[in-house]
Swiss-Prot record:
Gene Ontology annotations of biological process type: protein unfolding; proteolysis involved in protein catabolic process
Protein name: ATP-dependent protease ATPase subunit HslU
Keywords: ATP-binding, Chaperone, Cytoplasm, Nucleotide-binding, Stress response
Subunit record text: A double ring-shaped homohexamer of HslV is capped on each side by a ring-shaped HslU homohexamer. The assembly of the HslU/HslV complex is dependent on binding of ATP.
Residues where ATP binds: 21, 63-68, 260, 326, 398
Record bears the keyword Kinase: no
Organism: Sulfurihydrogenibium sp. (strain YO3AOP1)
C-alpha cells in the first residue's frame, strides 16, 4: 500500500503533462500533496497520526482540467478516487444524498481495486481449475467401480486431446451448459429514489448472505464459460476478510475525494436567507468528514482524517471567502487555473497521449480511412474555439469536442463507404464546415 518513493513532485508533474496542458500551479500543488503522503508514511507512528493532509481548493472555469488533474493523479498511484458534486447533497432531513455516502462510495472503489489486485494474484491457479471444470462438462471423467474417479494420470486420451484444443482456443465457439452462481437483485420495480442507493446495496448484501448461493444452468460458449468460472474460482481463492481490511486502510491513507461545484453551495454576498441557508447546511454537513470523523460502512468503520479532499469551482458568482470560515480553513492550499488560450488549444489537440486529433485518426483508421489534419487546420480550430468561448459561455477544452464533431460529422457518417481513401482536413475545409455557424451569433449559441 506504500506510495512509490520514486515519484518525486517533478516526476508527478511530468506524468500529468502527458495528459493535461498547462496549469502548472495546480499540478505542482497536487504533486506536493501526494509526496507528503509518502513522507508521512516514513514518520514514527506517534507523529504520523498528527500529520494531516493539506486539502486543495481549485478555482477556475469549466473545462480547464480541474477534474482531470485529480483523476490522473489517482490513477498514477492506484489510489481510490471518487468525484462528487456538492449540489447533489442536501442537509440532513431533506431529500438528497447524505454526505457520508461519499466515504461509503470511496471505500467501495477501494474494495473493488484491492479485490481485483488479489484476484490477479491467483489468476493462473483459477484458470487451471476453470479449464478442468470445462473439460468435465465436455469430456466427463470415467467412473471406476464403486463410483470413484480414475486417477489424473489414467485420464482418457480424448480428454487430453480436448485439453490441447482448449488451450489453443479451438473450442472457444463451442456451446456448453454450465452451472453458474445466480446474482441476487434487490431493485424494486426499477425505481431509483434519491438518497436510497446505500439502502439498496445493503439489501443486496443481506439477500446474498441469506443461505447458500443459488445456482442456475446457462448455455454459453466455452470462451464465455471459462471467464465466468475463472472469476468464480478466483473469488473462492482469495481471503475476503483480508481484502476488506486492506480496502479500508487504502481508503483511509490513500483515498482522494474530488468535490466539484463547491462554489454552488457558497452563500452569495452577505445575505443569509432562503436558498443560502440550505447551502450553508450542506457545508456544515461536509465539514465533519473533511475535518476528520469516523464513518460506518459495510466494510467497517473508516477514519477520514487522512483522506485528501480536493474541492473545485468556477466561483463566477460566489467567492471562496463566501464559504463558511470553518470549511475555508480546511482547504489551506488555493490554486487558480487559467482560462485556456489559442496556444493551449493547439497543444491540447496535438500533444497529450490521448490528444483529440490522435483519437479521430485512430477511430477513422478502423474503417480503413486515412485521416490527416494540416497545421493550418489545427490553428484554425484553436482560433475558433477561443473566439466562441469569448463570445458565449466559456466551456474550456470541451469546446474542441463540439467543433471537431461538427467538422467530422459527414465523414464519420460516410466512413464505411470511404474505405481506402485519404481525407485531408485543412483550414479552408474547417471554415466551410463552420463558416455560417460562427458568423451567426444565435446559431453559435445553439450548435457550438
Amino acid at each position: 500500500m506504500e506510495i512509490d518513493k520514486e515519484l518525486t513532485p517533478k516526476q508527478i508533474v511530468e506524468e500529468l503533462n502527458k495528459y493535461i496542458v498547462g496549469q502548472y500551479e495546480a499540478k505542482k500543488a497536487v504533486a506536493v500533496a501526494l509526496r507528503n503522503r509518502w513522507r508521512r508514511q516514513k514518520l514514527p507512528e506517534d507523529l504520523r497520526d498528527e500529520v494531516i493532509p493539506k486539502n486543495i481548493l481549485m478555482i477556475g472555469p469549466t473545462g480547464v482540467g480541474k477534474t482531470e488533474i485529480a483523476r490522473r493523479l489517482a490513477n498514477l498511484v492506484k489510489a481510490p478516487f471518487i468525484k462528487v458534486e456538492a449540489t447533489k447533497f442536501t442537509e440532513v432531513g431533506y431529500v438528497g444524498r447524505d454526505v457520508e455516502s461519499i466515504i461509503r462510495e470511496l471505500v467501495d472503489v477501494s474494495f473493488k481495486m484491492v479485490k481485483a489486485e488479489k484476484m490477479e494474484e491467483v489468476r493462473e491457479k483459477a484458470k487451471a481449475i476453470a479449464e478442468e471444470k470445462i473439460l468435465d462438462y465436455l469430456v466427463p471423467k470415467k467412473p471406476k467401480r464403486y463410483g470413484t474417479l480414475i486417477e489424473e494420470e489414467e485420464e482418457s486420451p480424448a480428454r487430453e486431446k480436448f485439453r490441447e484444443m482448449l488451450k489453443n482456443g479451438q473450442l472457444d465457439d463451442k456451446v456448453v451448459e454450465i452451472d453458474v452462481e445466480e446474482k441476487v437483485s434487490a431493485v424494486v420495480g426499477g425505481v431509483v429514489v434519491p438518497g436510497l442507493e446505500d439502502i439498496e446495496s445493503q439489501l443486496k448484501e443481506l439477500f446474498s448472505n441469506l443461505g447458500p448461493s443459488k445456482r442456475k444452468k446457462r448455455r454459453l460458449t466455452v470462451k464465455e464459460a471459462l471467464k465466468i468460472i475463472e472469476n468464480e474460482e478466483a473469488e473462492k481463492l482469495i481471503d475476503m476478510d483480508e481484502v476488506q481490511t486492506l480496502a479500508v486502510k487504502r481508503a483511509e491513507n490513500l483515498g482522494i475525494v474530488f468535490i466539484d461545484e463547491i462554489d454552488k453551495v457558497a452563500a452569495r454576498g452577505s445575505s443569509k436567507s432562503g436558498p443560502d441557508v440550505s447551502r450553508e447546511g450542506v457545508q456544515r454537513d461536509l465539514l465533519p468528514i473533511v475535518e476528520g470523523t469516523v464513518v460506518s460502512t459495510k466494510y467497517g468503520p473508516v477514519k477520514t482524517d487522512h483522506i485528501l479532499f480536493i474541492a473545485a469551482g468556477a466561483f463566477h458568482l460566489a467567492k471562496p471567502s463566501d464559504l463558511i470560515p470553518e470549511l475555508q480553513g480546511r482547504f489551506p492550499i488555493r490554486v487558480e487555473l487559467k482560462a485556456l488560450t489559442k496556444d493551449d488549444f493547439v497543444k491540447i489537440l496535438t500533444e497529450p497521449k490521448n490528444a483529440l486529433i490522435k483519437q479521430y485518426i485512430a477511430l477513422m483508421s478502423t474503417e480503413g480511412v486515412e485521416l490527416e489534419f494540416t497545421e493550418d487546420a489545427i490553428q484554425e480550430i484553436a482560433q475558433i474555439a477561443e473566439e466562441v468561448n469569448e463570445r458565449t459561455e466559456n466551456i474550456g477544452a470541451r469546446r474542441l469536442h463540439t467543433i471537431l464533431e461538427r467538422i467530422m460529422e459527414d465523414y464519420s457518417f460516410n466512413a464505411p463507404d470511404l474505405k481506402g481513401q485519404k481525407i485531408v482536413i485543412d483550414s479552408k475545409l474547417v471554415r466551410e464546415k463552420l463558416g455560417n455557424v460562427i458568423t451567426n451569433e444565435d446559431l453559435t449559441r445553439y450548435i457550438l
